[in-house]
Curated annotation (Swiss-Prot):
<dbReference type="GO" id="GO:0000976">
    <property type="term" value="F:transcription cis-regulatory region binding"/>
</dbReference>
<feature type="region of interest" description="Involved in transactivation activity">
    <location>
        <begin position="210"/>
        <end position="247"/>
    </location>
</feature>
<dbReference type="InterPro" id="IPR003441">
    <property type="entry name" value="NAC-dom"/>
</dbReference>
<keyword id="KW-0238">DNA-binding</keyword>
<dbReference type="GO" id="GO:0010223">
    <property type="term" value="P:secondary shoot formation"/>
</dbReference>
<comment type="function">
    <text>Transcription activator of STM and KNAT6. Involved in molecular mechanisms regulating shoot apical meristem (SAM) formation during embryogenesis and organ separation. Required for the fusion of septa of gynoecia along the length of the ovaries. Activates the shoot formation in callus in a STM-dependent manner. Controls leaf margin development and required for leaf serration. Involved in axillary meristem initiation and separation of the meristem from the main stem. Regulates the phyllotaxy throughout the plant development. Seems to act as an inhibitor of cell division.</text>
</comment>
<keyword id="KW-0804">Transcription</keyword>
<dbReference type="Pfam" id="PF02365">
    <property type="entry name" value="NAM"/>
</dbReference>
<feature type="compositionally biased region" description="Polar residues">
    <location>
        <begin position="203"/>
        <end position="214"/>
    </location>
</feature>
<dbReference type="GO" id="GO:0003700">
    <property type="term" value="F:DNA-binding transcription factor activity"/>
</dbReference>
<dbReference type="InterPro" id="IPR036093">
    <property type="entry name" value="NAC_dom_sf"/>
</dbReference>
<feature type="region of interest" description="Involved in transactivation activity">
    <location>
        <begin position="373"/>
        <end position="375"/>
    </location>
</feature>
<dbReference type="GO" id="GO:0090691">
    <property type="term" value="P:formation of plant organ boundary"/>
</dbReference>
<feature type="region of interest" description="Disordered">
    <location>
        <begin position="175"/>
        <end position="228"/>
    </location>
</feature>
<keyword id="KW-0539">Nucleus</keyword>
<feature type="DNA-binding region">
    <location>
        <begin position="116"/>
        <end position="175"/>
    </location>
</feature>
<dbReference type="GO" id="GO:0090709">
    <property type="term" value="P:regulation of timing of plant organ formation"/>
</dbReference>
Length: 375
């Protein structure tokens, strides 16, 4: 079996790279390894970067002029001054012009952290300024910068050569604008095809729902659904109410797949889940007459309602604590046992206060209030 042999010739432009190798330099590498050498030696050439005049070539013609590149193309170019004595650069072509956008980005050395260059972003507009039509062609222009990094190079030499990286910005469905359709249960997606105008495509409602569920910004993070759409839960009416009626109303998976918002109201949430709101408002059945709040003192043959009423009357007539008749609190009465056997016997209750004791309590209360008011 013959093994292919690749010959690397570092001196010519006719050499080929093995499959898988791409030219993807960093911003710092473009400045220090390519642009600096071109500024110091105008005859320097690279097998990956071609020399072109950007003012005489349209953006869609540049891929054919490049030496290599699939989606990004690199070029050496000289700045064309708009005026002989000015510093403004002529960026116009026959079909349009390049317009700068945003701020220039600084490029620092990874070893010395010194400023070595600047990167400017430009967008190509078809037509003439200021009514040009924006296209999807973008260019990154690299130039030398740094007072201490290139102190041995004159200012005119540093501004003479630049490296331009040209690429075509993709604007597909990931960046397409989604607008509501007029009818038919779908949505209209605006997709730009590159050089041509944007086209509007009608998509089904199932696809448009996927577009609408995407968050509009990073601060609005989509919350997970409150219910798992892949799980089918079974709710019955008997589990939601106190009634003994067994009406098996099972919630199907189609009702659960509905997305429940965190801020949905109770009627909308229960309607989406297929549940009956009235089943939650049913009152429990009334307690029977044989219900006893004190099962320890229960008697099977005696009515408990009369016993509980007598206990409340005795409890409401207890004397105040701290009164002069505190001795009556220690006196107790032994209640007789209830009829029928199994009753309560030997229970001690305080005797109700008499009228004289109540008058003494009122006198003590007025005396205490007089002390507070006269203080």
């Amino acid at each position: 079996m013959d093994i292919p042999y690749y010959h690397y010739d570092h001196g010519g432009d006719s050499q080929y790279l093995p499959p898988g190798f791409r030219f993807h330099p960093t911003d710092e590498e473009l400045i220090t390894h390519y642009l600096l050498r071109k500024v110091l030696d105008g005859c320097f050439s690279s097998r990956a970067i071609a020399e072109v005049d950007l003012n005489k070539c349209e953006p869609w013609q540049l891929p054919g002029r490049a030496k290599m590149g699939e989606k990004e193309w690199y070029f050496f170019s000289l700045r064309d001054r708009k005026y002989p004595t000015g510093l403004r650069t002529n960026r116009a072509t026959e079909a349009g012009y390049w317009k700068a956008t945003g701020k220039d980005r600084e490029i620092f050395s990874s070893k010395t952290c010194a400023l070595v260059g600047m990167k400017k972003t430009l967008v190509f507009y078809k037509g003439r300024a200021p009514k040009g039509e924006k296209s999807n062609w973008v260019m990154h222009e690299y130039r030398l910068e740094g007072k201490f990094s290139y102190h041995f190079i004159s200012r005119s030499s540093k501004d003479e050569w630049v490296i331009s990286r040209v690429f075509q910005k993709t604007t597909l469905a990931s960046t397409g604008a989604v607008s509501e359709g007029g009818g038919g249960g779908g949505a209209t997606v605006s997709v730009s095809s590159g050089t041509g105008p944007s086209k509007k495509t009608k998509v089904p409602s199932t696809i448009s729902r996927n577009y609408q569920e995407q968050p509009s910004s990073p601060s609005s993070v989509s919350l997970p659904p409150l219910l798992d759409p892949t799980t089918t839960l079974g709710y019955t009416d008997s589990s939601c109410s106190y009634d003994s009626r067994s009406t098996n109303t099972t919630v199907t998976a189609s009702a659960i797949t509905e997305h429940v918002s965190c801020f949905s109201t109770v009627p909308t949430t229960t309607t989406a889940l297929g549940l009956d709101v009235n089943s939650f408002s049913r009152l429990p059945p009334p307690l029977g007459f044989d219900f006893d709040p004190f099962p320890r003192f229960v008697s099977r043959n005696v009515s408990t309602q009369s016993n509980f009423r007598s206990f409340q009357e005795n409890f409401n007539q207890f004397p105040y604590f701290g009164s002069s008749s505190a001795s009556t609190m220690t006196s107790a009465v032994n209640l007789p046992s209830f009829q029928g056997g199994g009753g309560v016997s030997g229970m001690n209750y305080w005797l109700p206060a008499t009228a004289e004791e109540n008058e003494s309590k009122v006198g003590v209360l007025h005396a205490g209030l007089d002390c507070i008011w006269n203080y």
